Amino acid sequence: MSWQAYVDEHLMCEIEGHHLASAAILGHDGTVWAQSADFPQFKPEEITGIMKDFDEPGHLAPTGMFVATAKYMVIQGEPGAVIRGKKGAGGITIKKTGQALVVGIYDEPMTPGQCNMVVERLGDYLMKQGL
């Protein structure tokens, strides 16, 4: 299966009548492996900050997490594995695997729990595949 198929079929899938606003699979260096049409472009320093938060959980909490200049308040995630952010009625979930970052961005009416489930399920699957 291509990386684009993972994004199209597993991240942008419909959940209870809703779907993510955008999603992507990125390398740890920020290289885009596959993305949905409306996925924002991360700046290099944003990827650096995200990777540092995986290595040093809590790094982003004081300043927030920036994604394509949009600021997300970092909320409880899983240290070293998942970063979650909130911005208004929407948010973001980033799951780190051995080689990739699985990213989902949502807006209402999708819920944070639905976004977490979609992103983390694919991330867990990729980790089981050694990715």
UniProtKB/Swiss-Prot annotation:
UniProt-annotated location(s): Cytoplasm, Cytoskeleton
InterPro entries the record matches: PFN, PFN_euk, PFN_sf, Profilin_CS
A GO molecular-function descriptor: actin monomer binding
Positions carrying Phosphothreonine: 111
Disulfide bonds: 13-115
GO cellular component: cell cortex; cytoskeleton
Pfam families the record matches: Profilin
Motif (Involved in PIP2 interaction): 81-97
Membrane spanning stretches: none
Description of post-translational modifications: Phosphorylated by MAP kinases.
Protein's UniProt keywords contain Lipoprotein: no
Major localization class: cytoplasm
The entry's keywords: Actin-binding, Allergen, Cytoplasm, Cytoskeleton, Disulfide bond, Phosphoprotein
Oligomeric and partner information: Occurs in many kinds of cells as a complex with monomeric actin in a 1:1 ratio.
Note: The variability of the residues taking part of IgE-binding epitopes might be responsible of the difference in cross-reactivity among olive pollen cultivars, and between distantly related pollen species, leading to a variable range of allergy reactions among atopic patients.
Function: Binds to actin and affects the structure of the cytoskeleton. At high concentrations, profilin prevents the polymerization of actin, whereas it enhances it at low concentrations.
Family: Belongs to the profilin family.
Protein name, UniProt field: Profilin-7
